[in-house]
């Protein structure tokens, strides 16, 4: 959309408002139907192919998915298209987003273990970095309940020791996912517990001043997308050894003015499937590399 603002001084301004694939899907609703398909990719394809959605094939990019979903779930008249697509992705803790080239994209939780950019050290310089060690992502118990199923629970092995180290026990509950059986629900609960049952010193956010970079580094930053993996090296207060973390991009923000272009990357820990035996970065035994 374009908005024009005319002033008596003769100075006029034009403002443009745009939305991405998620915003467009959020404005659409379904007719009633019974969904088929047993993977996230199959169900997303079925949903986007419907007449009331009619999403272009060229505007999608889907992983197959790692979970087996219910094959006959009901979608009600008026259900929001974006909400349903997000439910499908959440059912296996996958990622649904609009890519840098504008396509609706689904990535399952088994992400690539290739770092696409290195920040700090001898890599791309950054302007600022935010680190957290809080309890927001710290849980001793995870409960997953699928649609039509029973609650399945994964708990830390030693609750007493956990409480002594981390304080009061904390629970994470996920409900309404479309997994096909309770065994998969338990697998998901155990996956999340492994990810969140230990405190981590994590880089939460990193900012880069784009115009200060070489053209090669600028292109590297601009080509990054959600679910890409990056390496971050920094030395807190320039004291002690450098900290190196392997992180996944979960958000990208651009702040642009006539004199500045700042890119902010929101980051999260690389999930547990990044373990690779004998990998120099992800499978070094007898070190704490797996605890990054």
Show the residue positions of the predicted features.
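Charged- and aromatic-enriched interaction segments used to assemble
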Residues: 5-136, 242
């Amino acid at each position: 959309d374009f908005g024009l603002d005319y002033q008596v001084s003769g100075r006029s301004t034009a403002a443009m408002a745009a939305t991405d694939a998620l915003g467009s899907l959020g404005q659409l609703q379904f007719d009633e139907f019974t969904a088929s398909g047993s993977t996230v990719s199959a169900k997303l394809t079925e949903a986007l192919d419907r007449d009331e959605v009619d999403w272009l094939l060229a505007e999608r990019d889907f992983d197959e998915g790692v979970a087996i979903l219910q094959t006959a779930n009901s979608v009600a008249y008026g259900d929001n298209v974006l909400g349903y697509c997000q439910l499908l992705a959440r059912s296996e803790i996958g990622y649904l987003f609009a890519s840098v080239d504008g396509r609706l994209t689904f990535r399952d939780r088994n992400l690539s273990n290739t770092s696409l950019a290195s920040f700090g050290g001898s890599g791309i310089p950054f302007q600022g970095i935010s680190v957290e060690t809080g309890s927001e992502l710290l849980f001793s118990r995870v409960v997953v309940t699928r649609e039509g199923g029973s609650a399945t629970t994964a708990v830390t092995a030693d609750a007493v020791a956990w409480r002594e180290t981390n304080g009061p026990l904390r629970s994470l509950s996920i409900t309404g996912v479309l997994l096909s059986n309770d065994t998969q629900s338990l697998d998901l609960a155990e996956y999340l517990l492994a990810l969140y049952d230990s405190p981590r010193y994590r880089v939460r956010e990193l900012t880069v001043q784009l115009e200060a970079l070489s053209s090669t580094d600028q292109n590297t930053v601009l080509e990054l997308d959600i679910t890409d993996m990056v390496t971050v090296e920094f030395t807190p207060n320039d004291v002690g050894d450098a900290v190196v973390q392997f992180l996944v991009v979960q958000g990208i923000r651009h702040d642009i003015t006539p004199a500045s272009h700042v890119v902010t990357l929101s980051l999260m820990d690389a999930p547990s499937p990044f373990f690779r035996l004998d990998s120099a970065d992800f499978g070094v035994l007898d070190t704490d590399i797996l605890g990054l």
